[in-house]
A protein has these predicted regions:
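Membrane-proximal, non-transmembrane interaction modules
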Residues: 4-97
Length: 97
């Protein structure tokens, strides 16, 4: 999947909730590629948080995960302003890893 293309497509259609989901999946992929987490399809977000518990990434990943779960699993619509805030948070974190 071309995450950048799909994220931009979802955002341009106003589907910010899907864009947040895609950013989260891209983040997991990038973290696994950098050996920061051990990705497995059947692992939960809590599993990844536990892997990061004693690392410098934990606090930021916790916040990103909370925002993702709130919007995706809580089925809350994400406004454009909220999306920009969340996107910036993702980008800053990805620049650190």
């Amino acid at each position: 999947i071309n995450y950048e293309k799909e994220i931009d497509k979802a955002a341009s259609m106003g589907n910010f909730r899907m864009a947040v989901r895609l950013m989260f999946l891209r983040l997991l992929k990038n973290m696994a590629e950098r050996n920061i987490i051990r990705y497995q399809q059947d692992k939960t977000n809590l599993d990844y948080l536990m892997q990061l518990h004693s690392t410098a990434y934990y606090k930021d990943f916790f916040r990103i995960t909370r925002n993702y779960e709130y919007s995706w699993y809580g089925k809350f619509e994400v406004s454009q302003d909220a999306y920009q805030f969340i996107r910036n948070d993702f980008e800053q974190f990805e620049n650190r890893i």
